[in-house]
Amino acid sequence: MTLVAFDFDGTLAESEMLDRIAARAGVGDEVAAITERAMRGELSYADSLRERAQLVAGLPESAAAAVYDGVRLRDGAGDLVAKLRDGGVRVVVLTGGFKPGVAAAFDAAGVAADGVVGNRLVAADGELTGAVEGPLVEGTKDDALRDACEAAGTTPAAAVAVGDGANDVPMLDAAGTAIGVDPKPGVDAHCDHTVSSMDALGRVLDDHGIA
């Protein structure tokens, strides 16, 4: 079975969930600057995620939920996911972002992934605590890709990875085919192809006999 592993924030969705949550908390500029440094590889993803999560501590959990509910896939992403799955391709999402936002975006598009690996912002007493938990805080996407491939009965060498940021590089390097969607500086060197839209991504996958 062919497997395509997608990053979410900046790839299947154009915006970064945590940046939008930070805007609600009044720390948007500070968090966006840390996000950009992390995506350029200037700061470890785990450190950047913890630092950003700390900045939104105290935000009502309901405000974060409202952000999750408003997350949407970028133009053409839902159609591409549906086409892949209809063709027997296994679609998984490997994200350092947050599973509730991924679920809301897929639900709004009327499509589903075969699997989602992501993180969550911890809340207590109705407020974000500033902590973040999940398999892709310290864990890396190459390991997540290997696990997804093993579950699907395939190998990373036979898989496609699609991402944009520095934290996607491990899975881009592990996959047989690596595709960047408007990749951040330095990430393009790890990509076999780069695209700027879901339509272009679909054409690349078509060329590989996948979509």
Curated annotation (Swiss-Prot):
Top enzyme category: hydrolase
One protein family per Pfam: HAD
Active site (record annotation): 7, 9
Reported phenotype of the disruption mutant: Strong increase of Ser protein phosphorylation.
Keywords: Amino-acid biosynthesis, Hydrolase, Magnesium, Metal-binding, Serine biosynthesis
Residue pairs linked by disulfide bridges in the UniProt entry: none
Gene Ontology molecular function: any one: L-phosphoserine phosphatase activity
Domain of life according to the entry: Archaea
Coiled-coil region list: none
Pathway in which the depicted protein is active: Amino-acid biosynthesis; L-serine biosynthesis; L-serine from 3-phospho-D-glycerate: step 3/3
A GO term from the CC aspect: cytoplasm
InterPro entries: HAD-like_SerB, HAD-like_sf, HAD_sf, PSP
Enzyme Commission (EC) number: 3.1.3.3
Binding site for Mg(2+): 7, 9, 164
Details of cofactor binding: Binds 1 Mg(2+) ion per subunit.
Catalytic function, reaction form: O-phospho-L-serine + H2O = L-serine + phosphate; O-phospho-D-serine + H2O = D-serine + phosphate
GO-annotated biological processes: L-serine biosynthetic process
Function comment: Catalyzes the dephosphorylation of phosphoserine (P-Ser).
Family, similarity comment: Belongs to the HAD-like hydrolase superfamily. SerB family.
Protein name: Phosphoserine phosphatase
